[in-house]
Amino acid sequence: MSLSALESTINSAFDARDGISTSTKGEVREAVDQVLETLDKGEARVAERGADGKWKVNQWLKKAVLLSFRLNDMGVIPGGPGQATWWDKVPSKFEGWGENRFRDAGFRAVPGAVVRRSAFIAKNVVLMPSFVNLGAYVDESTMVDTWATVGSCAQIGKRVHISGGAGIGGVLEPLQAEPVIIEDDCFIGARSEVAEGVIVRKGAVLAMGVFLGASTKIVDRDTGEVFIGEVPEYSVVVPGALPGKPMKNGHIGPSTACAVIVKRVDERTRSKTSINELLRD
């Protein structure tokens, strides 16, 4: 089926999803399987960046992923330590892979790396023991470091470094929610968390322990400008706090966590300066 035919079939099936189960056969199952394969190969992606810098979300692809949970039964997944098994509906991306398949794919997957089928991993990516969920897209030359997670349908750009223990949130439900997007050349510091559809624009640097959600205020220290839901390109961001407001008893209330843009750099400076130097105040 063409992508337009797939989209029509998936949208219709999703509207009638209460009637879809593991016993469903025919066109719907074939369409969902084809979509998952297309996502897995990177031939389609849940979100695409336009020439104007705006991201378009292909909601129907997310619907296909959701339908797969209704269509697919639980099953034993082999490959655990000590010949243990797992019990799930989503097989490993690497099921049945041998040396030739890995060489053709062109990325590294260190023992302990888990990637679920329908996630795309581009060439020269390095996956340390980490987790990449279904529908995600990880572009070329990116590092997903130890115990980092890339959530469902998240979009990770080229030459991104996702440091140890960092979390990139996933989003399948609510269906209208936007996926988390990390654009090219970003650095996500250790134990940071980016969730709830936040966009981190090109070349931005998040220090260790920065937490960003849809309502997190991102304050530019120099200008006082406040951003919500998006980190401007080439920003250097650290954890911070906004002063508390006076309470009814006259005392100052508790402070509120925020993120602080401590500086902005241009592309040339970003490419020539180490992360540690950028984060020094």
Swiss-Prot record:
EC supergroup of this enzyme: transferase
One GO location term (cellular component): cytoplasm
InterPro entries: DapD_Trfase_Hexpep_rpt_fam, Hexapep, THP_succinylTrfase_dom1, THP_succinylTrfase_N_sf, Trimer_LpxA-like_sf
GO molecular function, one term: nucleotidyltransferase activity
EC number per UniProt: 2.3.1.117
A Pfam family per the record: THDPS_N_2
Binding of substrate, residues: 108, 145
Reactions mediated catalytically: (S)-2,3,4,5-tetrahydrodipicolinate + succinyl-CoA + H2O = (S)-2-succinylamino-6-oxoheptanedioate + CoA
GO terms classed as biological process: diaminopimelate biosynthetic process; lysine biosynthetic process; lysine biosynthetic process via diaminopimelate
Pathway: Amino-acid biosynthesis; L-lysine biosynthesis via DAP pathway; LL-2,6-diaminopimelate from (S)-tetrahydrodipicolinate (succinylase route): step 1/3
Keyword list, A-Z: Acyltransferase, Amino-acid biosynthesis, Cytoplasm, Diaminopimelate biosynthesis, Lysine biosynthesis, Repeat, Transferase
Superkingdom assignment: Bacteria
Subcellular localization, as worded in the UniProt entry: Cytoplasm
This protein's record includes keyword Acyltransferase: yes
Leader sequence residues: none
HAMAP family linked to this entry: DapD (MF_00811)
Family assignment from sequence similarity: Belongs to the transferase hexapeptide repeat family.
Subunit structure of this chain's protein: Homotrimer.
Entry protein name: 2,3,4,5-tetrahydropyridine-2,6-dicarboxylate N-succinyltransferase
